[in-house]
């Protein structure tokens, strides 16, 4: 493994409609088989529905939903003297967003609604109201970290 320098993270282009890098990242996470225009259509349609339900702008509503799913701590496995401990660690800001977006998309895909846009809109609405599968996932991760607080001194 080369040890010369740390490669910085690539800059992604902001999405064309709202000019948000966060939304562009979300579209990229939702995208399947390189079909970006399809993913954009789904996201924009879902955001429109979300904005109508919440009475806020599309970006504000999306930000609120994302904020309610972002984890602050997670557990990482750490091997110490033949046994593995789940050590709670703080989540870096970039990873917080990535995990939240991934969980929202996963939860939306598992829903039983008709179209993906509707599934995504419903999941984002639930996330904005602090309920739903994605929020439950965050609660589970936080609970796991809380339960393993005793191993926090094994941080690296």
Swiss-Prot record:
Function: One of the primary rRNA binding proteins, it binds directly to 16S rRNA where it nucleates assembly of the head domain of the 30S subunit. Is located at the subunit interface close to the decoding center, probably blocks exit of the E-site tRNA.
SUPFAM superfamilies with a match to the protein in the record: Ribosomal protein S7
Family stated for the protein in its record: Belongs to the universal ribosomal protein uS7 family.
Keywords for this protein: Ribonucleoprotein, Ribosomal protein, RNA-binding, rRNA-binding, tRNA-binding
GO molecular function: rRNA binding; structural constituent of ribosome; tRNA binding
Record-linked InterPro entries: Ribosomal_uS7 (IPR000235), Ribosomal_uS7_bac/org-type (IPR005717), Ribosomal_uS7_CS (IPR020606), Ribosomal_uS7_dom (IPR023798), Ribosomal_uS7_dom_sf (IPR036823)
HAMAP family linked: Ribosomal_uS7_B
The organism of origin for this protein: Klebsiella pneumoniae subsp. pneumoniae (strain ATCC 700721 / MGH 78578)
Protein name stated in the entry: Small ribosomal subunit protein uS7
GO cellular component: small ribosomal subunit
């Amino acid at each position: 493994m080369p040890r010369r320098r740390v490669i910085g993270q690539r800059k992604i282009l902001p999405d064309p409609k709202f000019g948000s890098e966060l939304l562009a990242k979300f579209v990229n996470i939702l995208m399947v088989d390189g079909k970006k225009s399809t993913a954009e259509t789904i996201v924009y349609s879902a955001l429109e529905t979300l904005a109508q339900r919440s009475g806020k702008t599309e970006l504000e509503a999306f930000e609120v939903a994302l904020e309610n799913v972002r984890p602050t701590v997670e557990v990482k496995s750490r091997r110490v003297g033949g046994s593995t401990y789940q050590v709670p660690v703080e989540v870096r800001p970039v990873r917080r967003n990535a995990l939240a977006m991934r969980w929202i998309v996963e939860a939306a895909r598992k829903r039983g609604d008709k179209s993906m846009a509707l599934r995504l809109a419903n999941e984002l609405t639930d996330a904005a109201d602090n309920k739903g599968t994605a929020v439950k996932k965050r609660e589970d991760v936080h609970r796991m970290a809380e339960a393993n607080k005793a191993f926090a001194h094994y941080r690296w």
